[in-house]
């Protein structure tokens, strides 16, 4: 296997990975495939969603602008990336099933300190209010974004809706209005 992988270019390996992913997850709702053990998980991801074997609860899900950008060949292009599209497709599948709504976010804050951008999981420091644990430089805008995100996630955990009482800035993602909340510092 090692020799085979070393004889191929990264682009070839990535292309083959995407082909295989398309085979095991044809709807491309989300890019992670569970391990079906026939005990805890008795069916695949697509079957669970399309047959309504998932909980009827509100969902909040999203991606970052530079998700999964380990190598230039693998770097997703923002809204064109598979994770971004998968979040929208998941929301639309819930709507088709008549389920509670999904709220989708797109974290675009390019973190300061290097050129990694808004990399996978970079939103977590903001969401959990742990910016001070990061070595990266921050601005007042970063702390304001963190407070906004903590409020949104707290509201969602309490009510199933990220909006504070009396507000409706963050809309559910639906077929008629595929809304995605962009999270970044205010300029």
Language model features with spans:
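Mobile cap/lid helix-loop segments that gate and shape the active-site cleft of serine hydrolases
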Residues: 23-48
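Short, flexible, glycine/charge-rich loop motifs used to bind or transfer phosphoryl groups or to couple energy/partner
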Residues: 3-4, 47-51
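Short glycine- and Lys/Arg-enriched binding-loop motifs that mark or flank ligand-binding interfaces
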Residues: 7, 34, 58
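C-terminal helix-and-tail extensions that cap enzymatic domains
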Residues: 12, 17-29, 50-187
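Single conserved hydrophobic/aromatic residue that forms the stacking wall/gate
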Residues: 1-14
